[in-house]
Each structure stands twice: as structure tokens, then as C-alpha cells.
């Protein structure tokens, strides 16, 4: 418990006090956000706002995790390291995307093909490694079974280990891409994606702590309600650091934002959420916990699909938050109300998680 608190506190302090230093660094070098011409006109005033703030979020997370392990005199575990690898790897892809936008002063960053290849390499590496490193109980960080609140029994390795590995890599990469894009689409208003991330990752602190206390590896009497998650305490430490890092960053990212997280932060946080859902065996529960992200993605999919079929639009602009902007809602009002919706999704997800344990 102490290590989790230390991790969150260090992540918060590093982000809170490190972000203004990073802002000065970016302003000095004139690394500012380029605003799309086809976006809401109110956003033109944000042109030049420093971006790539995800660098601070990632750094604060790594430092929080490291200091917590040192203070608790514990060794990092493979699950936590895999989660950090996925977060940092996707953050690097996002950083390259942001840097190209800034250096070339355009809204298009990294070439789509190279972006997909980069995400694919990181995703495949994570997926393959997640099925390695069995512990004394022969549990690997991830499972080839599709999961809801725990493994469901739907095993992707139904036709053998080789087929299972291939299908798992495809499934995991789908989740990684989906969640990364979801957070990226949500990052359209000051503080929106950051605030929602605080709620969502806080839920996963609760989930991982509960899994740690009810782990099949620590309970004297193993029953059907215990969890077979590998290294849940280590995942809780990483997740607490992410919560602290996002909370500290939100101080500077809230309206009017002094800095944006950019693709650096959005891809990193999306990757971390995907990784957590895989490593905690909560792949479909994450859809509920991260429900606001899902709603944002669906609004974009509906808009594009409906327009292609009818040449008409469902929303004034997609994603959904831009629709409300063009409807005359104040940006802060939209953000706060979306935070409330995100909190309701999180409460529902955590409630379902706990109810399953009680019933099970």
C-alpha cells in the first residue's frame, strides 16, 4: 500500500512542478500547436500553445514507479515493465508525430503508413512478450483467453499454441490501436482527455489493488473468486503513478490550457489503458470503465459512416464534443459535463467488477 501511495505522490509532484519547466522549454524554442483549419473557429486562439506534454506524463509515471519500488525495497515485476514499455513505445510514436507537426507547421504529422508500422511493431512486441515469462505457478502476464472481468473461457488457442499466439497478437493490437485512437480523439478540448484519464486510471488502481488482495497466489484457500492476474501489485504501482502524473498535468492543461498533451500523451495513455485491460484480464470491462472514450469514438464512426451512405451528417461536427461546441456550449461546460459522464461510467464499471466478486 505504501508503495502505491508513494508512486502516486511522486507522479503528482513531478508532473505538477515539472510541467511549467517543460512549458518554458517549449516556448523558448517556439514549439507550439498547429490548429487545423477545418476545426472549430474558437480553437484558432489556441495556435502556438505548447504541446507534447505527454513527455511529462510519461516521465512522471516512470519516476513514480521507480521511486516507489526503491522506497519499498522491491524489484520491478515483468507485468509492470511490460505496461511501461507499451506506454513509452507508443509515446515515442506520438512524439515523432507531434514533432513533425511542429517543425513543419502543419496539422498532419507522421506519415500514416509509418505511424501504423510503428504502432504495430510496439504492439506485436508487447503481445509476444506478454505470453512469455511464466512464474512459479506457470502464469504469464497475459492470457490467450478473451476476458470480461476475468478470463471467460473463450480461448484463442483453441487450435494450438501457434494459432493462439497469432490470434492473440491480432486481438491485442486491435485493443491497443482502438484505445490509442479513442484517447487521441477525446483530446480535443482543454483538460478533457486528461481529466477523463484521471477517473479511468483511478478505477484501475482500485481494480489492481483488489486483485492483489484477492490473488490466487496469496490467499490460503484458493476459490473461484480469486484472481489469476500476474503481478497485480506491480500494475497498481504503475497505475497510481499514471493517475498522479495526469492529475499534476491537469493543473496546467485545464482551461485555458497552458500546454497540450499532444499525440505523445494521447497514444501513451491509450496504450497504457489497453495494456491494463489485457494484463488485468478486464478487456471488455474496460469498455465500460472507459465508456466516455468509447462514446467519443462511436460518434466519429457514426458521423463518417452516415455521411458516406447519405452525404448528410448526424452531428454538426465530430467527435461529439465539437458538436456541442458548435451548438453554443461553453468549452468548460462541455468538459465538466463529460467528466461527470466519465465518472458515471467508471462507477458502473467498478460496481460491476465488485458485484461479480461478491456473486462469484
Curated annotation (Swiss-Prot):
It comes from the Bacteria. Coiled coil: none annotated. InterPro entries: Glycosyl_transferase_4 (IPR000715), PNAcMuramoyl-5peptid_Trfase (IPR003524), PNAcMuramoyl-5peptid_Trfase_CS (IPR018480). It is an enzyme of class 2 (transferase). It is found in: Cell membrane. Its cofactor is Mg(2+). This is Phospho-N-acetylmuramoyl-pentapeptide-transferase. It comes from Beutenbergia cavernae (strain ATCC BAA-8 / DSM 12333 / CCUG 43141 / JCM 11478 / NBRC 16432 / NCIMB 13614 / HKI 0122). The lineage of its organism: Bacteria, Bacillati, Actinomycetota, Actinomycetes, Micrococcales.
